[in-house]
């Protein structure tokens, strides 16, 4: 690009892309851990992992990396599985 404003936009976009990758990557990692814990069947571990995953999803939504409805849907699905596990354990 030879236009000053476009050079600046490219620079900003790259910075934001890298920042967004961090938030989405963290959210993805913790959601995976929560799913693994839920599949494992250990209730305490599953509760803790789900709590951390929900926190990360909220953070990503707050930063604008995920849409808030997307984050809400993912949290809902995790909680649904956790509640099913708790019901099964009781």
Regions found by a protein language model. Name each.
Residues 1-90:
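Ribosome large-subunit tunnel/peptidyl-transferase-proximal elements
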